[in-house]
A protein has these predicted regions:
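Short, structured beta-strand/loop micro-motifs enriched in basic residues and often containing a Trp
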Residues: 152-159, 282-284
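C-terminal amphipathic alpha-helical segment
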Residues: 201-273
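An exposed, glycine/acidic-rich loop-and-rim segment of catalytic or binding clefts
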Residues: 156-162, 173-175, 181-232
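Short acidic-glycine-tyrosine-enriched beta hairpin
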Residues: 163-175, 288-306
Length: 327
C-alpha cells in the first residue's frame, strides 16, 4: 500500500567531489560535506541516477527522490508534469563552489539529444550568484565570432580571446539556454537550476588532470555542432533585491525570487511541484501536517497540490528561490 504523500519534503543533498571544488559550502551554509575532499556540487533537488537527493526527515527519511517519484508519480510532480515526463524527474537544483575555473563548455538542446540518440535530455540552466570573491563567469561569444573563428581559436589554444567574461556579485542572474558557451570561474558560489541532464560538451579545460590524474575528455566536434553563433546575450542581470519577482520564465522551468523581513508568505503548488531553496536567512516552512526548520542553502519540495507557509526565523531577512515546471 502506498504511504500517504507529505505536502512538504525537506531534502538532503548528494555531495559530488570535483577537481575544481572546495569547502565553501560548509563554511557559508554549514553543509555537512564528506571530509578531506573538494566538493564542487551539492545536488539539492535531484533524481539523477547515482546523484539523488533524499528525504531528510519524517517517515520518508532516507528515501531517494527517484524512489518517491516512482512511488507517488503524478501525486508528487503533478498530472501534467507526469504526462509530459513520466518517471523522469525534469529538474535538478545544485549549489556549486568554484575554487578553480570550470571548463569552458556548452550544452545541447532536447532536439540534438534526441537526434543523436543520447540518453539524457538537453540542458537549459540558470544561475543565481550567492557569493563572489570578485570572481567571473564566461558567458557568450564576442561580437562577430562565427563557427570558423571559434574553431580556429580552439585549434590555436586561444578560446578565452573569443569569449566574454563578466565579474559577478551576489544577486546576479545568468540564464544559459542550450547552445550558450559558458563557464563558472574561480571564487564564485552559485545556485543552479537546470534540466535534469549531464550532457556537457567541454571545449577547454586548462590542460589540468581530472580526479583520476588523466586529462578530462574534450568534445570539440559536438560543441561546434550545438553552439548558437547567432545568440545575443545581455550579460548577467543584477537581481539583488528578491521581492517575489519572476527571474526566469522558460519552457522548462519558472524561477521566482522571494524575500521576507517579517510575517509569512504562502505558496501553492498548482499543476507542478515547487522547490524552495533558502539563499539568505533561516525559515520555518509548514503546512497542515508538519513544520520544518530550514537553514540557508537548504531545499524543500512541496508536492503537487500542496500549499505551504514560510516565515523567517530570527531577525535576519529571509531570501529564497522558488522553481516549478510551467504547466
Amino acid at each position: 500500500m502506498t504511504r500517504k504523500i507529505p505536502g512538504i519534503i525537506p531534502l538532503e543533498p548528494y555531495c559530488r567531489e570535483m577537481v575544481w571544488g572546495g569547502r565553501r559550502l560548509a563554511e557559508l551554509y554549514d553543509k555537512e560535506l564528506p571530509t578531506d575532499v573538494s566538493i564542487g556540487e551539492t545536488f539539492e533537488l535531484s533524481a539523477y541516477e547515482g546523484r539523488e537527493s533524499r528525504a531528510a526527515v519524517g517517515p520518508l527519511s532516507g528515501c531517494s527522490l527517484q524512489d518517491l517519484v516512482e512511488e507517488y508519480r503524478a501525486d508528487l510532480v503533478g498530472a501534467e508534469v507526469w504526462s509530459r515526463y513520466g518517471g523522469r524527474f525534469p529538474l535538478l537544483i545544485k549549489l556549486l563552489d568554484a575554487q578553480q575555473n570550470l571548463s569552458i563548455q556548452v550544452h545541447p538542446d532536447d532536439a540534438y539529444a534526441q537526434l543523436k540518440g543520447l540518453q539524457d535530455a538537453g540542458k537549459m540552466e540558470a544561475w543565481y550568484v550567492l557569493h563572489s570573491d570578485g570572481g567571473r563567469v564566461a558567458y557568450g561569444l564576442e561580437d562577430g565570432v562565427g563557427r570558423e573563428d571559434f574553431s580556429a581559436a580552439v585549434t590555436n589554444n586561444r578560446v578565452a580571446e573569443v569569449i566574454r567574461f563578466y565579474t559577478v556579485e551576489r544577486g546576479d542572474l545568468v540564464f544559459s539556454p542550450p547552445g550558450t558557451v559558458h563557464a563558472l570561474c574561480a571564487g564564485v558560489v552559485i545556485y543552479e537550476v537546470q534540466q535534469s541532464s549531464d550532457l556537457t560538451f567541454r571545449i577547454y579545460d586548462y590542460d589540468r588532470p581530472g580526479l583520476d590524474g588523466k586529462p578530462r575528455e574534450l568534445h570539440i566536434e559536438q560543441a561546434l555542432e550545438v553552439i548558437d553563433f547567432s545568440q545575443q546575450l545581455p550579460g548577467p542581470v543584477p537581481c539583488p533585491d528578491l521581492r517575489g519577482q519572476v527571474l526566469v520564465e522558460s519552457e522548462h522551468f519558472v524561477l521566482h525570487g522571494c524575500g521576507l523581513e517579517s510575517d509569512s508568505a504562502e505558496h501553492a503548488a498548482e499543476g507542478s511541484f515547487l522547490a524552495l531553496t533558502l539563499v539568505g536567512g533561516r525559515a520555518v516552512i509548514r503546512d497542515g501536517e508538519g513544520e520544518y526548520a530550514l537553514g540557508t542553502g537548504a531545499t524543500a519540495l512541496v508536492t503537487a497540490g500542496g500549499v505551504c507557509e514560510i516565515a523567517p526565523l530570527g531577525d535576519e531577512k529571509l531570501e529564497y528561490l522558488v522553481v516549478a515546471v510551467p504547466t
